[in-house]
Amino acid sequence: MAKKDSVLEAGWSVMEAGVAKLQKILEEVPDEPPFDPVQRMQLYTTVHNLCTQKPPNDYSQQIYDRYGGVYVDYNKQTVLPAIREKHGEYMLRELVKRWANQKILVRWLSHFFEYLDRFYTRRGSHPTLSAVGFISFRDLVYQELQSKAKDAVLALIHKEREGEQIDRALLKNVIDVYCGNGMGELVKYEEDFESFLLEDSASYYSRNASRWNQENSCPDYMIKAEESLRLEKERVTNYLHSTTEPKLVAKVQNELLVVVAKQLIENEHSGCRALLRDDKMDDLARMYRLYHPIPQGLDPVADLFKQHITVEGSALIKQATEAATDKAASTSGLKVQDQVLIRQLIDLHDKFMVYVDECFQKHSLFHKALKEAFEVFCNKTVAGVSSAEILATYCDNILKTGGGIEKLENEDLELTLEKVVKLLVYISDKDLFAEFFRKKQARRLLFDRNGNDYHERSLLTKFKELLGAQFTSKMEGMLTDMTLAKEHQTNFVEFLSVNKTKKLGMDFTVTVLTTGFWPSYKTTDLNLPIEMVNCVEAFKAYYGTKTNSRRLSWIYSLGTCQLAGKFDKKTIEIVVTTYQAAVLLLFNNTERLSYTEILEQLNLGHEDLARLLHSLSCLKYKILIKEPMSRNISNTDTFEFNSKFTDKMRRIRVPLPPMDERKKIVEDVDKDRRYAIDAALVRIMKSRKVLGHQQLVSECVEHLSKMFKPDIKMIKKRIEDLISRDYLERDTDNPNTFKYLA
């Protein structure tokens, strides 16, 4: 036994000398030379020889235990006293130095005792040599000093936050101590340092938030908050572990932004409303950047954005309504005001789309806010006129020759058409818009001979992209009819040149319209003057050569005539409607006619005739003289050709005040809606077979909302009607459930 111990002690004395030399090097003892290769090999060989003897002369266990004791002694006798005597930043520097020394010590000793790692630790499932060294430091040094180190680091971070310069490299190395003592995991860093950092940061920024909120405006506060977040991210990059960033940022965001969100965003003098009011786009962009990463952080901003747009848009509607109800406003003035309103809404939309795109980075929340705001005021009426009609009138105005009021160039017109379509998105009654648009389109195509076909088709293409082919099918059909009408006219002229017997004595142009495409018009059995009868019969003869299956129905209300009025002073070219022309041509054969005589000869209704005679005798151009002279037409009146009439122009257009078609259009749309609701209900029930009342109504609204917002009461009425017509039936056990009857 004595011999055995002597071998172990002799070998260990060699190892102790090597360990002592290494520790002197680490402690920077003057004149201590480094290891030479022979010394390193001697130490390795000593361990090898002690651990490769056959039992009972294998000293692996004893050497392994004494290896661990080396660290315990070094940490207790050298490392801990050196760190304990220092404080604050100096203590941190010593801790960093000792951790660096520990890593060197472990690396060198692991090399000297390498044979243990290769065989002993593996066979016995013992901690590796490196683990033994680091566990010793963790248990003896780190556990005692981590709390003091944490306090010192937090103090330095506080100084840096207050603007002082600190040694960032030192902090990075201290953080490495926390991470390294987790033995490959971050648990020590997270529990012993990070959790306290997050708590301390929350307290720090909570205090700052209270102070900044009292001292600063919303824009200035946001600048400080944004800078704080930037610095905290920079702090992580410089010396904290990367996994800390999302946690630290979340803490700062919570204290600087979430906790004070209501006070900050809704600040009466400088919050979101004020920024929107004063067009502070940079500040709004900053508000977006700050609140975008926070869950639901943008909700109050988007809500205020919506409110602001709604207020501005509603103010425009109110302004237009007041102008429209002004008793001093003329009819033409009202039309101009309507067009001004649409231009204002387009400009408003352009303005806030810039906000959405540039300030709010096209975020869907702000697109939604913009849409909902515009839907509020774009569906209000202006002095009883629906926005659908106003928008249709605006389209009509800019598509007329010369761009109507706005006098737009081609490029500007195309851009304006795109913006009109964007406004149409927000109008609920798109079917009503379609009817008003189609009615006005018909008049443009028929009477605006110099209209731009390209822009007409361009707008319909945009409508189709937005609302589908069904929305534009009739409108496109009208354009096709106008193209075919030119072909018909060319063929008609050729027909007349071949058939010499059919001499008209005047220029006669006919436009053939397809009934299904065009709006419905009132037809009358007007007794045409003989001059017109010949023309009509000639075209009938021509059309009969083209088709036998189609019947022509003449719509005189859409026709125009150019008459040569031979007055005493000069001949004036008079442009009138077909009806007006029929009245005037009666006076070619007589100077005077009574109301009753005109009524009988033309076969017109009282209302229509009164309107015609009023336009010819009571308005600007008094081509007929009425007796007695009054502003109203009576069935006892007599009319005489006014040979004394004259005008400075050689060509005049005698207007026929249009009848108010609004009521009829609305009635037609309501009728079409009933059919649409019926079709949607049947389609849904045919697919679902059995469905509850609430779900059926809900699905019906969803089906139809693209074109109009169906009235719930109307849907219920249509359901009852379908039940009475045996399309649906109520479930006998549950009256709120419907069944489809095939």
From Swiss-Prot:
MF (Gene Ontology): ubiquitin protein ligase binding
Keywords of the record: Isopeptide bond, Ubl conjugation, Ubl conjugation pathway
Position(s), cross-link Glycyl lysine isopeptide (Lys-Gly) (interchain with G-Cter in NEDD8): K686
A GO biological process held by the record: jasmonic acid mediated signaling pathway
UniProt cross-references to Pfam families, sorted A to Z: Cullin (PF00888), Cullin_Nedd8 (PF10557)
SUPFAM superfamilies noted in UniProt: Cullin homology domain (SSF75632), Cullin repeat-like (SSF74788), Winged helix' DNA-binding domain (SSF46785)
GO cellular component terms, semicolon-separated: chloroplast envelope; SCF ubiquitin ligase complex
Segments forming domain Cullin neddylation: 672-734
PTM notes: Neddylated; which enhances the ubiquitination activity of E3 ubiquitin-protein ligase complexes.
UniProt xrefs under PROSITE patterns: CULLIN_2 (PS50069)
Record note on quaternary structure: Interacts with SKIP17 and FBW2/SKIP18.
Family: Belongs to the cullin family.
The protein's role, per its UniProt record: Core component of multiple SCF (SKP1-CUL1-F-box protein) E3 ubiquitin-protein ligase complexes. Involved in ubiquitination and subsequent proteasomal degradation of target proteins.
Name of the protein: Cullin-2
Natural source organism: Arabidopsis thaliana
The encoding gene: CUL2
